[in-house]
Swiss-Prot record:
Residues holding a divalent metal cation 2: H68, H332, E335
Residues in coiled coil: none
Classification via InterPro entries: DUF34/NIF3, DUF34/NIF3_bac, DUF34/NIF3_sf, N-reg_PII/ATP_PRibTrfase_C
Record's subunit section: Homohexamer.
PANTHER family linked: GTP CYCLOHYDROLASE 1 TYPE 2 HOMOLOG, NGG1 INTERACTING FACTOR 3
Keywords from the UniProt entry: Metal-binding
Record flagged with keyword rRNA-binding: no
Record-given protein name: GTP cyclohydrolase 1 type 2 homolog
Pfam families: DUF34_NIF3
Top-rank lineage group of the source organism: Bacteria
Example of a GO MF term: metal ion binding
Lineage, broadest ranks: Bacteria, Bacillati, Bacillota, Bacilli, Bacillales
NCBIfam families, A to Z: YbgI_SA1388 (TIGR00486)
Recorded family membership: Belongs to the GTP cyclohydrolase I type 2/NIF3 family.
Amino acid sequence: MKIANGQTVIQLFERWSPKSLAVEGDKNGVLIGTLNKPIQRVLTALDVTESVIDEAIELGAELILAHHPIIFRPLSSIRTDTAYGRIIEKAIKHDLTIYAAHTNLDITKGGVNDLMADALGLKDIEVLAPTTTESLYKLVVFVPHTHTDQVREALGRAGAGHIGNYSYCTFNSKGTGTFKPEEGTNPFIGKQGALEFVEELKIETIVTEGQKNKVVAAMIKSHPYEEPAYDLYPLANEGETLGLGRIGYLHESMTLEEFAKQVKKAFDVPTARVVGSLETQIRKVAVLGGDGNKYMAHALRKGADVIVTGDVYYHVPHDALMDGLNIVDPGHNVEKIMKQGVKEKLEKLLKDKKYDTEVVASSVHTDPFTFI
């Protein structure tokens, strides 16, 4: 079996959901333990409670990948005679590593908010509250004609060359490369001390900030030269906008009451708080996992008929109603959708690299509320 170590697991995860996406002041990354160990099993969880710790121990998971940080505010002490202290003590005693992916997982493509939008069947989905725009880079590499297809394929597989809904986009131009292999080299073409003239193809493509290291590594691995010549430089073009929340359209309009029932079914919750006339027709829907109180204005500006979010304060709906915005609040816990979503994504990332590390979604229910 090929088992990934903790560093590898998190490197793969952060290529998809980099910590750099997180909002300022957020707590992300390793909060307890170390990544310097083999990881046979990863447990994905929304919250880290004592029951989740017990589940990880029972399953033999060495790493808990959670959405909500177990440590959010600075600690002045860790008292093992308190419930919170016992959780930390138990994690350390059983050599568990706890990693949090909070707002970066909300923001990243395919993360919490995309999972929520997909669960509701939305189409024409956009970002609700932009936080950043991806930086773009131009990668230029010079390849002998014998290996151009191989290098182009490696670039595309690594994610380079995406422009809108087009992939594998490159520009190719012919030219002549020159080089003289010096002492200690093992040239693919030519011999030491002799100036070589080689017909080469210049392949140009576009990569994002988050992709560039992976793409360059794939290019170097596929290139026949021991020292490939390439350029990587930033572009003034702006890449894709990333941010919190999503907004899109239902495939067909329905009443607010019908939509609220759909929300309950999609997120498997027993109840939802609804703000607005139940007969109102709903077509354009905003979603924001977690606490969406600060994002009502974003939903209004983008023309949403309703926003689906959690933890709505008492006075916020009064303003929303005056502005004509309906609200469905199924609770904060609907972010539990990330457990299965992250499991499937991380599982694929590991399998693509031929690792046998297992990923398990937590079965522990961590919603503190009971509905009667």
